Amino acid sequence: MPSLATASMAMRRAGYQSASLANQVYSNNVEGQFDHILPLSTRLPLGLNTPAYLARTAGHFIRAMFKVDIYHSFFSGGVLGHTPLQPIELSVVKLAGVKTVVMPYGSDAFVYSDLPDTPWARAIKRVYPRTKDQDRLVKDRIAQIAERADYVVGCIVHTANLPKVDKWTVLWYPPGHDIKPGPLCDSETSDPLRIAHPSNHRAIKGTDSLIAAVDRLHDQGCNIELDIIEGVTITESRRRMARADIIIDQLLMGYAMTAIEGLAMRKVVVSGFNRTEPLYQPFYDRSYLSQCPIITASPDTIQDVLLKLYNDRNVISVIQSESYDYFQKFHSDAACVALFGDVYAELGWTELRNDDVCEA
């Protein structure tokens, strides 16, 4: 997950010794984003793939236990997540005297049988189907990891099936330090309203509903450009997002990396969290979601939302300023460092910076 790398880099720039590891890097990831890569796909003869991967992974894990004070992982596991040793991973970490911080990122924390009957949950089940046995295994793993973790950091929507949450932050990761804020929209311009929508999962993102809404607005004479960004690198995606006035994240659920990239670029961001859905209430009560300037929309309302923005360019520049202020306060590198600094302090570690190691 790129989020793990951006969080790790933020901690390192703040003076922590932090390293990130991945066992799968997608083609759209930035080269060199992760400090260590243990690829699952290495091809070896004579059926040696599995034992070779297990040996490399176990070796890295053992070295880490001698170096780190804090061990970050997901609900799918950490370094040993794709090995038969995953069930004992956090127990070994605790035996080594290392504190564990677990964060959800997505399907790792979803138990399909226990999800609410909502459009986003139905979309996830269609895109990432599971058998009942697979779902039961995920449920058991979540319960086991939550019980053994020293600290669980929440993440919007992904707390739906978690047995415990110690920190109700909306998102725990920053988008990276290399994103620059763009200019404010000119309210007097006759240029088209430019919309960008990075989409890696059309069904989950509501992409087809967005396209249909923009087509209907075109029929009404609206001068709107829609850029559907798919199948490109993160660098190219961000370049195209930077040209837009409005970033559409997703129309069915929460908000995530695309949204905070848009906030960092000083864009108007539209996403699909339902302010009345009970799942979001803890993030209003215990976190900062009530301050969020992101415009909410669903597949049913996106046309009206875009038409309102099209007809009032003045409001766009106001929201742009609010977006960047919100980003700096809650989703910047500094916000990430403050978040995990507080977590480490609650775990009793107050002298990590500059002399100890935190491995993400």
Q: Can you annotate each of these PLM segments?
A:
Residues 311-345:
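A charged, aromatic-enriched C-terminal amphipathic alpha-helix characteristic of glycosyltransferases
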Residues 1-36, 143, 149:
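N-terminal subdomain of nucleotide-sugar transferases
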Residues 62-65, 88-95, 99, 119-151:
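Membrane-proximal helix-turn-helix segments that form the acceptor-binding/catalytic region
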Residues 170-205, 211:
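Conserved donor-binding/catalytic core segment of Leloir-type glycosyltransferases
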Residues 111-112, 129-170, 212:
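A short, active-site helix/loop in glycosyltransferases that binds the activated sugar's phosphate group
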Residues 62-86, 99-102, 246:
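Short N-terminal targeting/anchoring amphipathic segment
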Residues 246, 251-252, 257-313, 317:
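Catalytic binding pocket for nucleotide-activated donors in carbohydrate/polymer assembly enzymes
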